[in-house]
């Protein structure tokens, strides 16, 4: 589990794609990382399989490549890194699982004087999970939804977040990894199951 508070901007050293997935090597300043540790890389939970000096290497599964922007990384690109939350630590952002739901393109990204306004477009079927003033994780960053208009999500980015994450390198058309709020998923899942039970009960009464 993660908090969505980026600890370091890692620099991609190498990405090797194969039929079995990929190996991703990232140079980082993160300390106290061991083999087998979970690290959020652009919001995707990956396992450290090799450590050489300041470089961490991860295995990336085909499913993760399919759901995220990791397969599009190039040498020199920057990725958001966060170590897994430890028991007793403060939850400064929101609960982020590291399970990316989908990627969304940047539709606009503008500086409005005191903050940046980021607009992404999400698939219609996922819009039910994104609500005004709710939490959302973009490339592993815990952010608050300003408002939603149709399938477009508007998010305000403060300068500190912009400068300390890979958002400073993003432009229109780039894909961001999106993880919707886990609490919303549980609520929707519960309501869907409740509705199915009600439908079954109504059918039973017809007999």
UniProtKB/Swiss-Prot annotation:
One of its GO terms (molecular function) is riboflavin synthase activity. It comes from the Bacteria. Its EC number is 2.5.1.9. Disulfide bonds: none annotated. 2,4-dihydroxypteridine 1 binds at residues 4-6, 142-144, 156-161. The keyword Ubl conjugation does not apply. Homotrimer. This is Riboflavin synthase. It comes from Aquifex aeolicus (strain VF5). The gene is ribE.
